[in-house]
Amino acid sequence: MKELTKVEEEVMQVIWNRKKGLVRDFIEDLPDPKPPYSTISSVVRILEKKGFVNHKAYGKTHEYFPVIAKDDYRKFVLNSLAERFFSGSPRALMSFFAREEKLGLKDMSEIISEIKKAEDND
């Protein structure tokens, strides 16, 4: 899996939210000013080449849908971030966020509860 550019990620967020759609649908969900159709069409084709989306053809019309789940990409990006900036240590990454984002005890307690739930489900 490859990391996406900012524009690719923005378009991918729209595709994940919509579940499927045409290029014009994706443009509709993007913030103003709306980018040109040709730009978003190119980005979607790049996303397809990168393996993030696929399409069904209905004549000349293509309906695109995500192939990679949002959670899978999120996990990939966070692991990549931990590798690049925190020597691969999730603990160092979490410590950084706890310090920099000024997480309180309540927030930390909720995070610990989430981790315990995830471990119980494994």
What kind of region is each of these model predictions?
Residues 9-14, 25, 92:
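Pre-recognition alpha-helix immediately N-terminal to the DNA-recognition helix
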Residues 77-120:
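Amphipathic alpha-helical dimerization/coiled-coil segments
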Residues 4-7, 58-77:
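Short, cationic-aromatic polyanion-contact patches
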Residues 41-45:
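Short, hydrophobic-biased segments on the C-terminal half of alpha helices
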Residues 51:
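Glycine-centered, phosphate/nucleic-acid-interacting loop/turn motifs that mediate DNA/RNA or nucleotide
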Residues 55:
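Short beta-strand "wing" residues that participate in macromolecule-binding interfaces
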Residues 20-29:
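Short acidic, hydrophobic short linear motifs in intrinsically disordered regions
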Residues 1-13, 69, 121:
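Short alpha-helical segments that sit at the start of domains
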